[in-house]
Amino acid sequence: MQGSFRRWLTLFVPLFAITDAAVLGAPQNDFMAQYKGTPYHDSRYQDGPQKIPGKVLCAYYDLGGEGVAYHDSDPENHGSGELNKADGSYLNEFRKSEGVDISYTKFGRTPPIDDNPHNKVEPPANLLYVGWTEAGEWFNITVNVAKAGEYSGDLLYTSNRGGAVLFNVNGEPATGPLAIHSTYDETDPLEWRQYHHWALARDFVKLRLPKGKSVLTVHILAEGHMNLATLDFRKAE
């Protein structure tokens, strides 16, 4: 993402059996009883666990801190308060004291950033997202599922060189490695903007979910440098 190429890292992580939407199931266990994280809330968002079916925002990962709600490679937020200077605004300072790196989509700038002509889809303006991702990082999102069953999720993202993620549900493996396709576009003359070519991966993940509260864990497996914005879940057909 903007400015993050200064932290370029080459990672060699073997990937096995990458699938488009592997479903292994996720039986309930005592994970929820022992889990110390809590659903995200602040002065603007007070709706409790994010709803499925519906659009789940990655930036609304759980409260609880490092090792509980998330694991990040370093304690600094390289988006909020760093790239986006602390100026008292909600977006620039969003969760700036936490290790997960967060930014938001910016429109109307010169040159264009997230409303650029190289997008595969145009994201909403001022959309918060998790970025600066690196292999080995993860974050938890508590959700409330309306009805038990299998759900399919579309991922809104950018990735300048591809990568892979994996999902757990309630502490149990729920997918195999899922390939994220690169959004790199050689026709874009601005190298930093390779982190801002937005795309929508339809039916990116399928999860079998119980009714009620569950915790989704998103694991970054390979490459990193992806921006993960939303997962839009609906009942699988």
What are the residue ranges of the model-derived segments?
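Bacterial N-terminal signal peptides
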Residues: 10-20
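Bacterial N-terminal signal peptides that target proteins for export
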Residues: 2-12
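Extracytoplasmic
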Residues: 24-237
